[in-house]
A protein has these predicted regions:
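Signature aromatic-anchored transmembrane alpha helix within multi-pass, membrane-resident enzymes
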Residues: 213-229
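Membrane-integral, polyisoprenol-dependent glycosyltransferases
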Residues: 1-217
């Protein structure tokens, strides 16, 4: 994916956030599927590292997606036990809080207002630095992100109902759709924001590719693109 390659080479923390977010989502899925505590503690650890990297979004995505996932499965009790795990909270606090405590001690209220309120809440409430867009701002970006395998992505959405019936695939769909919806509603829009949900879509495309692998024509756009490069 060209956008993923570009963000991987950009001088920003977004590639690291995407990596840590993907790791936290994977461990969260494993915990709610296998109910083994090591996966839950891994989720807290990766979320804490993501929180250090880019802030609250690293916590919001796994918390929101797992909540919706558990509500749909009628397992809100399991979600509550996971989110409020004392050991998990301790792991998160030991990793993430010291830096924020030090920054708050140095800068006081200015750090809280600037980092949390302005650059997180403020970005959602309205456009900053002219980065606005319509509700469908991310649609062409997603289409570009899945090129040259656009046909596979489209087929995933055509077979949406089938994937929705499978618990793992539903989790991946929720991951992608939550990020897409959240940032589509955000006042500030930047192209790379939607990348935080694309791993979920990419994994669904990989599943579809296993079914779709006999249709060799799907690789023609990829060969043309790499030939031009």
């Amino acid at each position: 994916s060209l956008p993923v390659c570009l963000i991987g080479r950009a001088a920003t923390a977004d590639a690291w956030l995407n990596l840590l977010l993907t790791a936290s989502m994977y461990t969260a899925l494993r915990f709610y599927r296998d109910e083994k505590m090591r996966w839950l503690y891994g989720t807290f650890a990766f979320s804490a590292l993501g929180f250090l990297t880019k802030g609250p979004i690293a916590v919001l995505v796994p918390v929101a997606v797992t909540l919706i996932h558990c509500i749909l499965r009628r397992r809100t009790g399991a979600w509550l036990r996971g989110v409020f795990s004392p050991i998990g909270i301790l792991i998160f606090s030991v990793i993430a809080l010291p830096w924020y405590v030090l920054r708050t001690a140095e800068e006081g209220r200015a750090f809280i207002d600037g980092f949390f309120l302005l650059h997180n809440v403020g970005r959602f409430q309205g456009p900053m630095q002219g980065h606005a867009g319509t509700l469908f701002y991310y649609v062409p970006i997603v289409l570009m992100a899945v090129f040259p395998f656009t046909a596979i992505a489209i087929r995933v959405f055509i077979r949406f109902r089938m994937y929705w019936q499978d618990q793992t695939s539903r989790f991946l769909l929720l991951w992608f759709l939550f990020v897409l919806s959240f940032f589509s509603l955000s006042g500030t829009k930047l192209p790379h924001y939607v990348l935080y949900g694309l791993p979920g879509l990419f994994l669904l495309m990989a599943r579809e590719l296993e079914i779709f692998k006999f249709y060799r024509w799907v690789f023609v756009p990829a060969m043309v693109m790499f030939g031009l490069l």
